[in-house]
Amino acid sequence: MTNQLIYKGKAKDIYSTKDENVIRTVYKDQATMLNGARKETIDGKGALNNQISSLIFEKLNKAGVVTHYIEQISKNEQLNKKVDIIPLEVVLRNVTAGSFSKRFGVEEGHVLETPIVEFYYKNDDLDDPFINDEHVKFLGIVNDEEIAYLKGETRRINELLKGWFAQIGLNLIDFKLEFGFDQEGTIILADEFSPDNCRLWDKNGNHMDKDVFRRDLGNLTDVYQVVLEKLIAL
């Protein structure tokens, strides 16, 4: 392992390794919102996110989804394939909530007849604006074929995740994915999947995700621990 920091993020730091095609991702005990405008250190959060994301990515790998995940190496570290991240947040919504409800003036909790896929341009200076396919092409981010792939793969991943979470009594409301190009130029799933980048509601409508922090609904690590234990039992 090497200790050369190559990326410092809000929730994760990334380091190089002896293998130029492999990175070490370290999950941090930090919760943020509004693109980092509010920050708070929460002991144990990094380890919980790392373990949850590792479990999800292991299941996705076994289900045939090509991801950057290699292995978990400690409670708050994992090894990943190095990718060239596509500057898009791909958001899929199964149920109205959050910014979607605010943007369109609809109540939270409405089940969408067909899940909606949205793109957001990853640019902190611009506050990650909501963009459409034409904007994506104008910005030269990806082409038509790659846009179609991102949407299709996100929908396929959604069906897998919805099924798994349903088995443990959780409703997958929405989530954000990030993809990147691997060393062969293939688009693969990257980043993480944890309650930091998805919404999960239990059967009583209780939030089991980062909204607990955003809305001051309780102890975040207690909620994440419940999600982890449910996934371990799956």
Swiss-Prot record:
It catalyses: 5-amino-1-(5-phospho-D-ribosyl)imidazole-4-carboxylate + L-aspartate + ATP = (2S)-2-[5-amino-1-(5-phospho-beta-D-ribosyl)imidazole-4-carboxamido]succinate + ADP + phosphate + 2 H(+). GO terms for molecular function: ATP binding; phosphoribosylaminoimidazolesuccinocarboxamide synthase activity. Its EC number is 6.3.2.6. It is an enzyme of class 6 (ligase). Keywords: ATP-binding, Ligase, Nucleotide-binding, Purine biosynthesis. PANTHER family: MULTIFUNCTIONAL PROTEIN ADE2, SI:DKEY-6E2.2. Belongs to the SAICAR synthetase family. This is Phosphoribosylaminoimidazole-succinocarboxamide synthase. It comes from Streptococcus pyogenes serotype M1. The gene is purC.
